[in-house]
From Swiss-Prot:
Protein's organism: Human immunodeficiency virus type 2 subtype A (isolate D194)
GO biological process, one term: symbiont-mediated arrest of host cell cycle during G2/M transition
Gene3D superfamilies per UniProt: 6.10.210.10, VpR/VpX protein, C-terminal domain (1.20.5.90)
Name of the protein described by the UniProt record: Protein Vpr
Domain of life: Viruses
Subcellular location: Virion; Host nucleus
Additional record remark: This isolate is from a Gambian case of 'neuro-AIDS'.
Keywords per UniProt: Activator, AIDS, Cell cycle, Host G2/M cell cycle arrest by virus, Host nucleus, Host-virus interaction, Modulation of host cell cycle by virus, Phosphoprotein, Transcription, Transcription regulation, Viral penetration into host nucleus, Virion, Virus entry into host cell
Amino acid sequence: MTEAPTEFPPEDGTPRRELGSTWVIETLKEIKEEALKHFDPCLLIALGNYIYNRHGDTLEGARELIRVLQRALFVHIRAGCDRSRKGQTRRRAPCPAAPTPRGMH
């Protein structure tokens, strides 16, 4: 079993990032790109501001935003999003995620 290489701080004097930070940042970029295809940008900005106010500019905040966006996308697509399967016509899910409100059939 080999040891993990020692991590050194950047030469330009910026602080060292936590392990996995590159993965978190790349994942956040990908999920934000997908979320923009399905949700109103104003809603996503409000969500980002809310999480930023709670966590600041930290990896924990980025992880929290990833968790929330994953859940929102899952529920949205499960409920029958038109864009969830390209090339297929929309059909009702056998078990919709949320019941239809009264008077909106």
